[in-house]
Every structure is written in C-alpha cells, then in structure tokens.
Amino acid sequence: MRNRCILPVLSFVMLCTAARGVAGSLTCDTKSISFTDGYAGWQLLAADGERDVTRQARYESGNSAVARVDVNGHVTPIADGSTLIRIQHDGDKLEIPVRVQGAGADRPVDFKRELVPLLSRMGCNAGGCHGKASGQNGFKLSLFGFDAAFDRDAIVNEARGRRVFPAAPDFSLLLLKATGQLPHGGGKRMRRDGNEYRLFRSWIASGMPSSAPDAPHVVKLRIAPADRVLARNGQQQLAVRAEYSDGSIRDVTRQAEYASNLDVVARVDADGLVHTLQMSGEAAIMARYLGYVAVFRAMVPHGERLKEIAEFRPANYIDDLTLAKWKKLGLRPSPLADDAVFLRRVTLDLCGRLPTAAEARAFLADTAADKRAKLIDRLLDSPDYPAYFAMRWGTILRNSNLAGSTNAAYAFHNWIKDSIARNRPYDEFVRGIVAAAGEWQESPAINWYWQSRDDQLHQVTADTAQVFLGVRLQCARCHHHPYERWGQADYYGLAGFFTRLGRKSFGEPPPYFASANVTTGEKDPLTGKTPEPKYLDGPSAKFTPEQDPRHALVDWMAKPDNPFFARALVNRLWGHFLGRGLYHEVDDLRETNPPSNPELLDALAQDFTKHKFDVKHIICTIVNSRVYQLSSEPTPHNKNDRQNYARYYARRLPAEVLLDAIDQTTGTRGNFSGVGSNARAVDLPHEGFGSYFLDTFDRPRRVTGCECERSTGATLAQVLLLGNSDEIESKIAAGDGRLARLMKEKKPLGDILEELYLTAYARRPSAEELKRTLAHLEGAANKQQALEDVLWAILNTKEFMFNH
C-alpha cells in the first residue's frame, strides 16, 4: 500500500460531461478527480464540440483550501477534503468533483520517477548541458536521464556532497543555482514557489533517498487528444497521463517534455499548449516522460472538408485511402500526368533510364486503354529493372570494395540482381543476407558481414534494425533512445542473435560460420554478460548449441503480425516511387515520426504480407495507382502540400541515373575501366569506379545503411559541371554521338529536334519551342555548333534533370 500512495490514483473518462453539468455543448475529458498526495496535479481539457476551449473557459474552485485550479485548467491539491471545480464557457457550465487524501502526508519523493523527468524537462541532462560526455563545469548527468542511479550519485556524493545540504535544503547548491540565486551557466530553471522546487526540496530534506526497487513504474504514456483537425492560428491544450504497473494513473502534463516535428505547421510550449501557424499540413507533437513517448497529431486543413472529388477516379485501394485523406484535409489533387510525363517517370523509377525515342513514339501513338499497365509489366520484365534496383540495394547494403575484395563485391552485386530478376520473395532475400554463411563464392551475401568486420556485432545490429526493420537503434547502444521507447536492453537483445557468428582466419572475405563456441568478447553493459537474444519489442529467445539464432530472427521478421518488417519495405518502396515515404525518412519508423497516412501504410503492409512478400506485386500496385500517376504541376489547392501526395513530388535524378541520361541523350557511353563498354553507371557493382561527375552529384560512398547517404540536393559545383565542363562538351560534340549521327544522315532540323526532345523528355517539342529553336538554327552559320548549343541547353533544363 505504501507504494500505491506514491502516485495519485485518478480516474478519467474521455470527452464525457460531468454528472452535474448544465445541458449544453461544453464537455470535459475528466469526470472526477481523486488525489492521494500533495504533489500531484491534473490538467483538465474543456471542449465546445470538437473545438478546444481549455484556455478560453473560466475555472473556479468551490473550496480553494482543498484544491486550486489555475486559469489554464490545471488542478492542484492543497489539503484533504472534497470540493468542486466549476468550468464556464459561453453560458455553459460543468462541475468536476475533486477529492483529496494524503495531501499533508510526509511521503518520500521518488528520485527516478519524480525528479529525473524534471531534470529532463529543464534540459539539465541534455547533450548541450550536463548530459554531454564530459559533463558541464564538473557536473555530469546521464544523457536524457537513462541512468537514474548514476544521476543520484552525481548529485549526492560527487564533489564531496557539496550540491545538497539536507540540514538546510534551501541552501543546497543544486537549488541555489537552479533558481538563479547563484550564477548558473544554464540560467534560471525553476521558481522557488513552483512544484519542481517543492519536490527537490522535500527530497533533499528527507536525506536524498534512493528510489524504492519495488516502486510502481511507468508502463504506458497516453496523450489526449490523440489527434485533432485544427484551423490555422488555432490552439489545442494537451493532457499527458502515465499509466503505472500498479494500475494507477498520474497526470504528467507539466512534467513531460514536448517537441514538434514540423514547427512551421504547429508549435508546442512547455505546458503542452499547441499553436498552429499559417502553414497547412500535419505536425506530430511528441510528449516524452521517463523514456516513454506519446504523440499528438495536429492536422491543419488546406481548405474546407470535401464531400466529393469527382474528377479523381480511384484505381485501387491506394487511391481510395489517399482520397479519404484529401477529403479530410480539403485537398484537391492535380490532374493525371500526360502520357509523355508518365512514360518518362515510370521508366526512370523502374529502370533508372530514359525511354528511347522509339519507345516514346510507340507509347504516344498507342490508343489502348490499358497501355500504362502493359508498359509497367514490360518494364518490370526487362533486364533494366533488376540492374537498377540492384544498384539501389547494393548502396544500402554497403556493397563496397573498401573491404579489399573486388571479386566478392561483384559476386554480391550479381546475387542481388539475380534475386530481383527472379522476384525472390523478400523474406527469402533477407534470409539470404542476414543468415549468410560459408565461402563467398557459394554465399556472396557474406560480403555484407565482411564490410563490418572492424565493428561487426554493432554495425550488423544497427544495419539489421535500420535496413530491414526501419528502426534506428544506434542511440540505444549507449543510452535510452531520446525519441523512442528503445533502450540498451533492446539493442543488446537484437545483438544477441549475432553473437554466434564467427569467421575463419583466411581469405578476403573469409568463410563465415555460426557456432555456440564463438566468443565475441562483447558484453551487455546492463548484465555484464554476453548479449542474450531478444526479439525487438518482444520476448527473449533460447537456442540449442546447434542452432543458428539468425534463422529464428528472420522467421520472426516474416511473421504476419511483425510490426516492422513489411511496413519498412513498403515504406521504402513508397518513398522511392512517390518521392517521400509515408514515414519520412524512409528508414525511420518511430512513434514520434508518425506516417502521414497510417491507414494506407497498414494496407500496403497487409497486402505485401498477404502476397507472400512479393515485391513486384507491391511495385505494380503503387505505380498503377492514380496517386502515382498525378501531374507534378501544383494547383492553387495543393501548392503547399508536402505530405499528402496531392501531386507528384518532382526530384532531381540520382547521380548514376543522371549520368546515364546524359549519355543516352548525347548517344555516348561512360568509360568505366574493368567493366564492359556498354555498362551504364547504374550497372557498376560498387562505388570504387572513379568518376568526378558521380562524386559531384553525391554518389553514396556506401559506408552506412542509411538512405540519407544519398543526396539529391543542388550545389554550385553541379551547376558549373553541367554548364561549363569539358566532360559534358565532349559528350555533346562526340564524333560518334547522337548529333553527329543525325547530321551525317542529313535529317531535317525539325526531325533532329524531335529526336532530341523525344530522347530527353519523351515528348515532341511544342509548336512554340519548335518555332523559336528553328529560327535560332536557321539563322546560325554553323548548324552543327548551333545544334550542340541546343542540346547543351536541353541537358541543363529542370525538365531534364528532374523526374517529374
């Protein structure tokens, strides 16, 4: 019973009117409040329909000697007894019964559960203050409070105990600095009349006790409301409640930390009040408390809610679920892209190349209603599809020659390409990598392990989580993840699946094998023992000496109810084809980074699992959707949309694709040593092929499994290279290039221009473009040079450099 008294037991019913309320539209999320100690608090949420009026309502306590309520609806206990909190707004009234017990009881303050969250909220244990590796001015705390015992020792025992003074708590250095009574680099962090000061003072006065080992602990954090559609320049008060292992609930609205993932849409203050700004869109507001997180989603519509969008005709469930979101947000989509734009887009996305002029002519002339679907099937059946996606997978799987074995890098590249060409089920593809063993000639995927040989256990653990599960687990190696639920136990639990992996002492790469006799020397810092396998967010696993735990790990990944595996892959594919993942970034699936359309993500993941991890099926579903086929031209209704796919998001071509596009348009080939003369840049098996162009346009170095290593941003060096480099000039003027061939064939200037436009843009020049360009050419003394200028101009247009 003593531990139960540490926490206030409070009951609440979401959005229910109090029993003694006067009839009207005013509601409160709380039916009654029951406090069991004097350190508690409770945030009321008042609403008028769906509109938050917490900060507009008036509050009054029937007996302020028992409980007080401030102007923002926050209730605090004062003394034992019962009273009513009256809420008034626009003539409506509510009364919330409040009962207080134990307000005067001198119960101990729990350091971990009550003070560590305050240190986090005040920023004391952040990386820029006492939480950094070296501490600050001789005082170091654990980063984000992940080690409460360490923090207590630092406060109580370090520096000969000078930070606390139990005999006269108010003169403790900890409180004097935090209240600004003594100089403090971090400034004033608390008020002497505040609840934070009361808690710290009481703890010091009682002798700075350690946290009771059997005290209730947080099991879940909830935020109310979970989401809201808010107007521009609107506001919403949040309430955060922690559920404890003994069944009790504590309001921690004023102890939690808050952050917005999109400040241009919505901001949040220290007390959980969300303010929306002028920008429409969606923002996720994170609340963090004792390592747990909860998220509120603020949706700011682009316009009034729409009943119908008659001009958009769904083709599959992707369109249905996206359409529902547009209606909710008042978004009208752009029209469908025309045939030329679609042909170029889907060929680039599926094959990493431009359509040929012949392909463009045939597609534009085709009048069949299903020609787009047939085109998609042809492209997926072509050898260019596995070649392009082998490059993309080789990048995030870090297939590199940096490890010293070019032959193994070639073999791994070919293994990936063959798996894609055969449409190998994704779970089998992952098993071939994660559970790879043997010699590289028979098992090329061991090169994935060989790339990590200097820090194998940790690199493989981090890559497995990020690449195949979409979880960035690296932070949890050293401390609890600041924006997720993952801690060191989760990290080392996943690492435990790889502790039996060993390698021979010969060969590059050497043969790999799994054995219970392998000793990594790595210890779990929490236990001091070899990491034991534990499924992420799941149970521990036990294996016999003969078993390879990695196979069990893949079995767990492929289970239909796995919350990460299928979602990670469909989100990665969605990001590739639509320019932005439903989770953004595509390999960062976490609660505090929620998907822009969770219903769509779930539907894609379920479809993927239902079809036995058929990657081609999901790709077909995505690119056959009307959402994928929308124009990139914004309309007045969607010009500010960045999250909901009301138009196609244009993006610069990746380095390898752009170089190949230039070669294709100019009729030249890249000159890469060690590969065939017909090899494209996307065919290169690793990053070791020298190319100033590829490096300038941010070809990944393949040193990380993160998609973020590839950049499609613009730099001055890129502009200068395209506009004024010998490399581009030589391709345009090549004697065996496209222009030279067309001139030798004595093609009419109009035909030459059509060929260039069809090759570069998959469309014919408009009448105005043709008129202006022909006028330029016909007035030029040197037709060859004038055509070279035209081609150079084409290569420098956004229409060429971007997939749109």
State where each predicted segment sits.
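Positively charged n-region of N-terminal signal peptides that target proteins for export
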Residues: 1-5
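N-terminal edge beta-strand
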Residues: 24-32
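Bacterial N-terminal signal peptides
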Residues: 8-17
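Short, intrinsically disordered, charge-biased short linear motifs at domain edges
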Residues: 108-119, 459-466
